């Protein structure tokens, strides 16, 4: 039985980390694509040479040809320009939109049956454009954002409560940006909702508010510290979690940028919502009920994404 084929489009920091994780977890064979000659080949060879020590048999190949991704089961897209200090995710729009056109056409022509996970920023607009350019079914194209944002939220909460991260559940709604909506009401520690933990004296509303804001600023915090790029370890592990759910038909409940068709009041666009990921791709969107305050924050985030999508249409007339 052939191993799954996983195409990684972009061999930068996230792409290289993804390739290593795929090999370590033995999720499949890897094709690492990048337009920079030598970079994907070098990283693929370096990771392959760690196989004898790590004990994996995955095959890794670096390439500049989309023909090599033919028949891929999963495509994870990281191609594009990363953020640098002082840049917002939205500043990347024009540059990375052109990249998504090239990538979308490459996937359309060579791996039309793949499950596609986009990581390129500004995420919600880029995954929308990628689906448009590729023509793949919307349930087979999604964006990695909510898993990462939720992981950051869970990390900060576990630190605050001094408990295992395994016992913290949390999810983040909305666009992958400053308007994201970390859901306090739907987040728990061992099943105990965060508002109840305030009543129990475990924390205060002020501390939770600060954690929510730090979650929103999570990417910028790392950009500011690194100074030469953006996060890559946590984004890569988040995308692997999604890919594994698809490849193993795990039916995982994971927040991600998915195409909404009326869920949570959103129609005809991608935004961060809780989903079920299995062998059918995005098999279901969980239409959670929101309070008026939560809905207002979510709508504000959706409107920010709409603005970026409209900007994409203005840049590339084929999207209008």
UniProtKB/Swiss-Prot annotation:
Keyword Transmembrane helix included in the entry's annotation: no
Gene3D superfamilies reported for this sequence: Lactate dehydrogenase/glycoside hydrolase, family 4, C-terminal (3.90.110.10), NAD(P)-binding Rossmann-like Domain (3.40.50.720)
Keyword Oxidoreductase recorded: yes
Catalysed reactions listed for this entry: (S)-malate + NAD(+) = oxaloacetate + NADH + H(+)
Family in the record: Belongs to the LDH/MDH superfamily. MDH type 3 family.
Chain's gene name: mdh
GO BP: any one term: tricarboxylic acid cycle
Function as written in the Swiss-Prot or TrEMBL entry: Catalyzes the reversible oxidation of malate to oxaloacetate.
An example Gene Ontology molecular-function term: L-lactate dehydrogenase activity
Residues binding NAD(+): 10-15, 34, 96, 119-121
Pfam family membership, one: Ldh_1_N
Assigned keywords, A-Z: NAD, Oxidoreductase, Tricarboxylic acid cycle
Species of the source: Ruegeria pomeroyi (strain ATCC 700808 / DSM 15171 / DSS-3)
Residues annotated to bind substrate: 83, 89, 121, 152
Protein name, per record: Malate dehydrogenase
């Amino acid at each position: 039985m052939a191993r799954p084929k996983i195409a990684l489009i972009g061999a930068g920091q996230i792409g290289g980390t993804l390739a290593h994780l795929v090999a370590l977890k033995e999720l499949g064979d890897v094709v690492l694509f990048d337009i920079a000659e030598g970079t994907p080949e070098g990283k693929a060879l370096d990771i392959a040479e760690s196989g004898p020590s790590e004990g994996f048999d995955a095959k890794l190949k670096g390439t500049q040809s989309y023909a090599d991704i033919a028949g891929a089961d999963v495509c994870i897209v990281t191609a594009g320009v990363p953020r640098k200090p002082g840049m917002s995710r939205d500043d990347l729009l024009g540059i990375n939109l052109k990249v998504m056109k090239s990538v979308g056409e490459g996937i359309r022509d060579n791996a039309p049956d793949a499950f596609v996970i986009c990581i390129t920023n500004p995420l919600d607009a880029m995954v929308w454009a990628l689906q448009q350019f590729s023509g793949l079914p919307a349930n087979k194209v999604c964006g990695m954002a909510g898993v990462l944002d939720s992981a950051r939220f869970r990390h900060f909460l576990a630190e605050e409560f001094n408990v295992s991260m395994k016992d913290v559940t949390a999810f983040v709604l909305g666009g992958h940006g400053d308007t994201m909506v970390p859901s306090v009401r739907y987040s728990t520690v061992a099943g105990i909702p965060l508002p109840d933990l305030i009543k129990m004296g475990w924390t205060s509303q002020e501390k939770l508010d600060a954690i929510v804001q730090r979650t929103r600023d999570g990417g910028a915090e790392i950009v500011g510290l690194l100074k030469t790029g953006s996060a890559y370890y946590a984004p890569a592990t988040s995308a692997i979690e999604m890919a594994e759910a698809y490849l193993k038909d795990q039916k995982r409940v994971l927040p991600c940028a998915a195409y909404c068709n009326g869920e949570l009041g959103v129609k005809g666009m991608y935004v961060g919502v809780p989903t079920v990921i299995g062998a059918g791709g995005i098999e279901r969107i969980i239409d959670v009920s929101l309070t008026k305050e939560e809905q207002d924050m979510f709508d504000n985030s959706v409107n920010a994404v709409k603005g970026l999508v409209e900007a994409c249409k203005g840049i590339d007339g084929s999207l209008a």
